[in-house]
Amino acid sequence: MVWGTGYGNPSPLNPYGFASLHRGGLNPLILAPENITFDTLNTHNDHEETHGESPEVPKASIAPAGRQNVPVLQQNQENEDNHALGGSEDAKDEREIRFSAIKTLYNYYSEGPSTPIMPHLVNRLRGLDALAKIDATLTKVDMNAAYIFALRPTFPYSYGYKQRFSNRRLTTSALCYARTGLSSFLTVDKTYTSNSPLKGGSRGWPIFNVDVSSHVAEPHMRTLSPIGLEVFNLATSQFSKTLLTASSKVFTQSLYTADILSIFGEVFLPHVMQPVSNYTPILVRALLALIHILGPGSGNCSLSSSIFESSIPQFLTVSHSTNMSNRTRYCLHTRSAYKDMFRNGIPPQSTLPPTLAPEGSSARVLIPEALVTSPMFPWLLILVSSGPQFFLYSKDASINTVDIGSRGRITSPIPDVAKLDLHRLWNLFRFDGYRYIDVVIVGADRDYVWPYQNGVYVHGGKGPNGTGNYGNADVHDGIGTIFSSFNNNVNVQTSDLMLGLLTLWNHITTTYATEEEVTMAIKIAAAFALVYPVQPIVYSGCPKAFQRHTSYYQPSSENCYATDTAEVKSVWDTVELSVQVNNAMVLGMTLPFGQPTLSSAQWYNNIDKAEISMFKVGNLPLQNLDYLSLDMMEFYAPTTGQLYDIRSDNLILSAHRTVNLGIGYTALADFFAYLASVPAQSFYHDRMVTSPISKQTYSVYERFIERFIDDFVGWDRCDLFNLDTLLGAKHIAGVASSPIPWHCSLQRCPLPIIMHYTGLTFGQEHITVRDVAGVEGLQQIVMRDFQGRIVVERLGTAAPSRIAVKLDWSRLSAWYSDTTCAIPLIRSCDGDRQLRGNMGSYTGKTRTGFVYTYFSPNFLSSFNVSEPIFNTSINLTPPYDDTSQAVIQNLSMPQMLSFDPYYESTFYVVSADNEWIPTSGPAWKVPYLENVVKRSGRRLLAELRIASNNGSGDRTFLTTCKTRKGRHFTYFSAALGGKILEFVCAPLSSISLQGGQTIYAPIQLQDVIPVRKEDPVPGSIYAVFKFFSEPKAWEARALKSYKVRFQDLPSHIVISELKERAARSYIGSRGYVDTGFKALDIYIDILSQMELPKYIHEFLILLRGKVCEVSRLYKKEQVFVILLTVFSELTAIVRHRGNKSTGSMGRMWTLLSDFETLLGKVSYKNPSIIEEQVVPWLTSDPIPRTPDFYSTYFKTAVQFMHRTFVPVTLRSAPPLTFHEYCGRPELWGTTGSGYIGYGKRSFNKWSIYGAYPTEEIYRLALYGDNPPLKPLEKPELTKVRAVISASLQSYILMSYLEYIMADTIVDKAFTTTLMNDRQLENLERHMMTMTGGVRVPVDQSNFDRQPDLVQIGIWQQLLFHLASASAPYRARDSVSLVISRLASTTTFPNLKVRMSDGDKRVLHGLPSGWKWTALLGALINVTQLLTMAELSNTLASLRSTVVQGDDIALSMTDREQATQLVDTYARQGFEVNPKKFWISPDRDEFLRRVATPGIVAGYPARMMIKLLYQLTEPEEPSHYISMLPKLAKVPNVVQEHVKPRSDVPWSETVEELDWREALAILRHRPARTSELVTQWLQLIGRFTAAHPDKRALTLLYRWFVRDLTHATKIKKRNLLVLLQQPGFWGGYSQSLVGLLRTTHLADMIVSELDIGLPGPRATSSRFGTSPTSLAPHYLTLIVPSSVHVQSQKELDLWGLCRSSKYAKHYSNIFRYYKLTLPTLVLWAQRLGDKHVTDFIRSVTLGSEIPKYDPHARLFTSNGVSVGMLIRIRVRHFTHRVLRRETPKCIPVIVGLYREQTLSVPESVRLSEPDKILLSLQRASGYSLNLVKKILQITRKPVDHPVDARFSQAFPNNWSDLARTAGTFLLTVPAEVSGDNADLVPERLGFNHSSWLHAIFRSRKFLLCVVA
């Protein structure tokens, strides 16, 4: 037997979708299936003899599985035992039990749950008996040789025994109710008494109050059964209180049984297999008992030993060998249970033949031959598609193999296997992109494989009474058995329900079913159709009695298959089967596949055809059976009661439509309406839009979509649904439509709907299909009127199956041009939808209208399906033309999303005093509209949904607005042909669709009055949509658009417009105006000096004037809010436009972005920030996910962990124990906040170490209280954000595990959090490469709020695993303690957050204050991404992925796959920020760095605040020094109980000190520290008295720093800061300070200080190990902020280089390059804001170039002028860019866009100089005349770039130039007049696309030209 592993699938009972362990399926990495042989079946044969006789086993469980013809329930011993278990009183006659089960099932699905049966079934799930069996089994097992695996047997049950099946048939329906109803909807009291059976109490069960849960209407919620709850609590209590408490509420809110078991197996059992003896016996005992309770055996409600035997072996395998690579396994399974099944087939010791085990296969599906020829074969393929489920080997040697592509093959003994439609078969399987599947169809023997006979399958045993009559065999072994056996892809609830119902149907087809049973069964099925309207509940072949059917329609015999028919000739499809028996209706739906024939290949190729499937109803007369078949192409007119048979053009009599509009159609219509509404969530929606249909049916519909449309139908097939079924439940209409890929829950495409109206009634006009003359298999689409006359001929063609439909839109357009299409839809008084014609809109006799539009699923989701969608007239009739025929072909959601879903919108609210209050933003959110109106005293609710996009840019939007008074406003807006979208308002009959103009129209239905903007109506609402698809439109309208975007939300003010002339007059000619915001002033001044387009300079002038006016009129707080709102909006618009900028905007859009950061930090506080942010963050209900999300997420997380992290024992640092780690603060005592306890005692981590001894820190971390999380306010540049502060306990515990895992998790390229320097460099290089594919930056909104407890908990447990596996031997005990402590304090059942009204339990969300927040965020983010890719079938298209926090740098193969992926994000409820999302082949953004081909740039505006305010000024104490007062301060509480540390100078209790006093403490206390400092100072003083040797001085300095660091316990970089302070040196200040300023020692100190400054750091330093050495590539530069004096604009960078170590290295780069402030900004943009690391200070400058004083590090002068000293980290520029250049090329460091040089070809070097000039002219873009006028050529030697000089001007002898190979410096004078008037930039050839554009607007241009 072959064993396999797999993951469970989501279901209503498994909402989180973990591996369902009742089917097996722990971590697939635990077990290698290919290593398991058939030896497992026969290794322990004697076990079956002793197992049942064990005295520990109760009598009820000792009946061996092989006992036959003795009903278990009738055994006295078992009855007694059952009585002891509480079940014997309910033991009844076989027929009574069956009827009772049927009645109970009927009551549940028709009237609600039936309570009386629940206690009876509870007693059948008794865990005491299960534990007794476990104990009996374990007594015979050598625990030292036993291992626990995750195995799944071939069958969930052991087959082949008549008696067992008889018992199961009696209780199968009840069992369905037990598993779907009872175990799903139990609630259990939290109180437990000591008499619990598992705690040694009595055998009774008095402590649980079993009742129906309130979640009975939500089948996807599940609570744990009492026994399961108790067993699991017992099991987990032996390890730690990690996941659960004794409350069923936990499971209701977060986890459910299978999830818990999965986590239990994955988390508590190490992935490295260890002997069972490593665990406590009670843990193994409880685990196996829980497995038994929840396994498939529990479903039998029977405690026979055979059930136990078939459950336990899935998980317990015993090994008798210590050699893990070559061990013999056997199952604790009596061989008698399987011996008959294999008696003729498989030898006990045999293994799989090589032919059936190809190398590299990871999954195999073996299917018996008999099943291939059955009508259930397609079902089996679907149900086994997710993993190996059915393995059976035959001795048949006839094997034929056919390869299926590159990932699988089909092997079969069937001769015509090659004739199978392999592509269709392949489409039935779902793959994750990596699996290789073998489909092996094996010849079978009747002795152990069920033969197929009379529509049912029978088991391999004997028939009733020992006969071989298979026709009278046990009916349970029919289709229901197959569903039970192969239902891995069918959830537990559905499969069991189908098992019961199908068994019931097979039962009533036999002769002994009573009429009462049949009636009850039909009622059950009718109720079932309400819950599962699309399941094939009635399907059991096609009896010959079908031909004797006497209904109104007599099908031909060819519609019913026969086994002797060579070929199926199906000519019509069946979508519904309606059966009426005794006035009770049963409805079923057949799948679209035909019946089998002898030639399975012939039958399988006809799978797209469907047949009527009937069943024989016992002994009832067939005359009572009526059915109506509705073909997809049939059309029902509800208003006239007429039904058209489109195939024959005949009208079906209305008398025969008695049952076709019953329950089934209502449910089906609801389903399709839901189908159209649920899955179309896209990335631009905040939350998942829910349908009016109840949420309980969501998983049912989802399963149908995913399994039957995605898997079975396949990507290339689609079923065409009709308009009215989608729009409501009262009408049915069949309309041919275009082929659409129905895939992945329809999220890929909107639904194209053809709306057709005729006259005053609806439905009499329809499209029919008739055969095309002379063409076999092709049908013609025509349109008929209500009299049957053809209105339009040859409208299109369609295949008989209608898989492909092609419409001739040119003919439709010609017909349409003769008709009027305005058909209003008006709600009638009775609420029913009726269509009343607008008589004024019709002309001619036909009165026929045809409107073609799109309705996306979003369109329907806003309305109840039972109500009319439109209640007002609509006049939106876009004209058709010949080009519109491509619309259908181009229709797809990927095209819609890739077209750029952003557009600009502006809403104007007109107040009573005619003031316009504009607001704007992305129209799908309209972020400011509600705020403006609400704060203006009105209430306006707006909802907008994107309804369609035809792929060419045309859009339709539907928006519904509602005011407080209840008045409704609706309007349409559209973009036509990809051109400018201006505005379209409906319903206004006077509005026409015209591009190129803006229409201002009131959105008021009552008052259809044209209103101009110049004449506003008070109280009206206006809207303007603008869509710019051309760069010219953006440039021309940018300034105009920005004028209306200023507003004051808090004060309800309207800012009047400032005309451009008024703005200029206000500003005057000064060119510089103080706006009150220093950073904004400087930045605008910088931009004003740059060579930018004229309209941008005009905009800057206007912007500055606006800011000044607002600052003059309002208070500073109001001004801040106004400008913050306006600038944020400006950033959104500019970034949106930057996504598409390819023309004149180029990359300059980054200069206009992030103006809001120039305002400084938010100056106001928001007291309600905690409630507004923390409540939805941590304490609100979790966001609902689809059921398949959690199973995929769990599988992906485990696979990602094993693929990414290989446990490596810590080697880079000493393996410290946790106690030793607490005493090493240099490993964990970093800067940052933390707190201990509940009081207001905020400590820096250094101060905690200084105040507490190591023992106290150790005790607090492991055994102290667990304080709750604390929310705090954090002001930022653009908002006040809430952060969650965690305690020191969690910090130091997580730090320790991170320290242990340092060598395991470092240097991982999937996240920047774990990257090293080389990987960071490669990331930047990769971002600049832009080779192939598309870039998809995915930024989740409020990422910390997105993960729920399950997502976070999974990675917490996996990290615990990783830490345990990485722990050195010496630290294993410490790691176990830390993990246990973390599991009890940071996992969510025990995690709380402190709010104003008390501590609240954390329900979801990732706290921001954990040490692991960044790591967990990265892991969760990448797992979510891989999960979304798995669910959207786009995993194979991922090219590269890097994450950090909520940002993802993602590269994919194509746009369609990217769109599908992001659409899946929205469908799962994840909010993707639309402002930061796009799909582009040549642009990416990651961590605020924009990447385009050849360059990675930042946002220059973001660096200004950092330059001005955020970075440390050296003249003031470092931030480390400023911490010293805290370090020296000990709270009174600590002072009383904790003795100060003697080895830490600042631990003494002192008053608050400034840093100088702290230095004094450091210098003078304790004595040995002071003495050490004194000795070293004397030594250094004596050594430097003479001329010191630099090498000796360097060595001396290092010894000094090392000794002082060790003595003072100060980190090295903190000590280096102290060494620079003059006060530190005391009496030696004169000599030593001079030494530090003038010798090489100063350079060493400065260089080493550079290591600790902000910027990329060594990866290892984050884990507490010593940081790697970083080269100090820093340059200190000075640039003036005033540019009036020309001499100040030219600065010598060479004189400003502070790092003498690298000065010579960069001399040729910086000596003669002149740098200006705009150039610096561009340079900073090139580097990114993260690399501008230090602002020194503002200084005073004179009119001349100031002299640099290296001692004071200042610029000194007598004059007064503002300037600033900037320290730039150039490592990431020089080393990553400059070093890649050849010695012949010096890059243009001031270049904005790309690294480019102007080259003179070698062929012209020895030619005439004119050719060289011509080459330069072509390269630069100048005219030849201009080149001759402006170029002053200078020479630089090529071979010695370091010694290059540019001082010598090149002579005018051009012949010398021909002999010179080198780099040319081109100096362009900027001031031009007179003869040089043509040298202005515009005439110099500066165009927007030139690479030289906007380098800087200085007096000289620099070009670097390589010869």
Curated annotation (Swiss-Prot):
Pfam families, A to Z: RdRP_4
Reaction catalysed by this enzyme: RNA(n) + a ribonucleoside 5'-triphosphate = RNA(n+1) + diphosphate
Top enzyme category: transferase
Has keyword Lipid biosynthesis?
no
Which Gene Ontology BP annotations are present? DNA-templated transcription; viral translational frameshifting
EC number in record: 2.7.7.48
Residues covered by region (Disordered):
42-61
Highest taxon in the source lineage: Viruses
| Biased amino acid composition, Basic and acidic residues | 44-56
Sorted keywords for this record are:
Hydrolase, Nucleotide-binding, Nucleotidyltransferase, RNA-binding, RNA-directed RNA polymerase, Transferase, Viral RNA replication
Molecular function terms, GO-annotated: hydrolase activity; nucleotide binding; RNA binding; RNA-directed RNA polymerase activity
Comment field (misc): One molecule or two of Gag capsid protein is replaced in the virion by Gag-Pol because the fusion protein is essential for RNA encapsidation and replication.
Q: Which family does it belong to?
A: Belongs to the totiviridae RNA-directed RNA polymerase family.
Q: What does this protein do?
A: RNA-dependent RNA polymerase which replicates the viral genome. Catalyzes the transcription of fully conservative plus-strand genomic RNAs that are extruded from the virion into the cytoplasm where they function as mRNAs for translation of viral proteins and also as substrates for encapsidation to form new virions. Once encapsidated, the positive strand is converted to dsRNA by the RNA-directed RNA polymerase. Displays ssRNA-binding activity.
Q: What is this protein called?
A: Probable RNA-directed RNA polymerase
Q: Which organism is it from?
A: Giardia lamblia virus (isolate Wang)
